[in-house]
């Protein structure tokens, strides 16, 4: 309504925000494989390269799941594992990512793991999440 009142072409705006079907299916497949950890963390792992943008969008989307405070997507790219992390306001994914050698900000962060697979990184991620909450207590 705001955009229409401001004179925007809402059909054009809608078209601008549409997603490619293949990318949408890929995001949904990532999300479908997600598991909860510590009750409020969603962790998804994919064994195929999906790109940083798609992984980040899947992590963003998982925050819309009731009870999820932070989300993590592990994916391979160019011979290494990558992490894309997102959160609301209760979990600082920057701190978790920095503990893993990455960075970002409180709500959007990531890390790279040269020479590692996503399966290698998964237990390390869980241990790091545990350490984060132990330090917060």
Language model features with spans:
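Hydrophobic helix-and-loop "lid/oligomerization" segment in the mid-to-C-terminal part
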Residues: 1-137
